[in-house]
């Protein structure tokens, strides 16, 4: 997908542009650019105008890929608070069913580190 062309098409339409940024973030992550992915996801969240359910776990994935493990775990804890099903392996697997293998593995790695960390 040509994201520059999609962004040009969506200009002035935040309802469309937020989807462009969200997808662009995943594409950048797939290309090994987690910092850029996070920036695109932040833009998508800003255009969303609220607290999108996907922001905590996508931030966790991007930060994990940047080796910012503690911050990634803090974001994953926020994801669990907003989506309690992510507190289980089954919930994580259900979320990532249609994801790419490396994306799913990253989420599983974050989950395993979070689950192993003492709570409280």
State where each predicted segment sits.
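Conserved positions within tetratricopeptide repeat
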Residues: 1, 38-39, 70-77, 104-111
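Alpha-helical adaptor scaffolds
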Residues: 2-53
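Boundary/linker segments of alpha-helical solenoid repeat arrays
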Residues: 11-16, 48-56, 81-95
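Residue-level recognition of tetratricopeptide repeat
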Residues: 26, 57-61
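Short helix-adjacent coil turns
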Residues: 32, 66-68
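Secondary-structure boundary elements
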Residues: 49, 68-70
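Short basic/hydrophobic patches in alpha-helices and adjacent helix-turn junctions
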Residues: 61-65, 78-81
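Terminal, low-structured helical/coil segments at or just beyond the last alpha-helical repeat
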Residues: 78-120
């Amino acid at each position: 997908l040509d994201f520059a062309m999609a962004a040009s098409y969506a200009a002035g339409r935040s309802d469309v542009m937020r989807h462009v940024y969200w997808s662009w973030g995943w594409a950048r992550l797939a290309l090994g650019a987690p910092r850029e992915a996070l920036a695109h996801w932040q833009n998508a969240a800003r255009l969303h105008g609220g607290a999108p359910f996907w922001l905590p776990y996508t931030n966790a994935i991007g930060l994990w890929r940047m080796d910012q493990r503690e911050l990634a775990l803090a974001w994953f804890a926020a994801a669990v608070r907003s989506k309690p099903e992510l507190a289980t392996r089954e919930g994580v697997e259900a979320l990532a069913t249609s994801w790419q293998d490396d994306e799913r593995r990253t989420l599983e790695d974050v989950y395993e580190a979070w689950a192993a960390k003492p709570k409280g």
